[in-house]
């Protein structure tokens, strides 16, 4: 009888020990780190990172909502390659590329991107006879059945849809004709320029809808920065962050002041980080209007997209262009296509000799 009780007691103690040991070996809960939300400037004509090469144009790596997006590719493939390597960016892990428009200072680096990631998806604006490829229904031209076959297009039997070539054969390009949500919370705005010199040019801008509001990345803003922001407000009535080229480099001071005040007072943009073709006078005006909500976005800068991205920027010191920035910016501007839109008046405005 005592042996039976002793056996039962031993079994009970063993069970308690086993249960307690199981409890102590349960894995402790772990918290999943939030996905990165940041923008790194890979191509521009001003900046303080001595490891990178300045050139006129724009490219930025956008890492947000779990996606890695290359927005534009700059003016020179070799320069983009050097800058990408300097920042340790792996272009083989892109989710997709966005080409804002067809100008060379935004698309010339694509050849390098394709050399390391030949099958990456590329979004580009759809334009008739555009460099990214296009098509038209053959009914767009008038026919004359009285002509002999040798005088008729396609011997009088054209295809229903005429497809046109691209400068990037074999690339995985998807053409965007209208504002389109390409993946949940990420939308490409498609607008057309009405400005002299770029009339009918179609441009894409990138919007990411976040809990803090819209993050808006623009390439050159040929359709007008105010028009692009107004379109973004249809996605979310709050613009949290705006960066890229505002195309005020050719504008006179009254226009610059009007746009700066509109972005601040009318559209109520939280934070602003202008670059590329925004222009030196516009940098100054926007700093004055936005104060500590203006972020320096020179070449090599990484901007963290948080509720207060100013605190997370890795750029210290002055917000504006220093003397070296200004000299390089003006020199590269003088060589760019942006000068050709309004001629000598731009040279005077930019202070280029």
Enumerate the predicted regions with their spans.
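Active-site metal-binding motif and surrounding structural segment of the metallo-beta-lactamase
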Residues: 78-123, 127, 233-243, 247
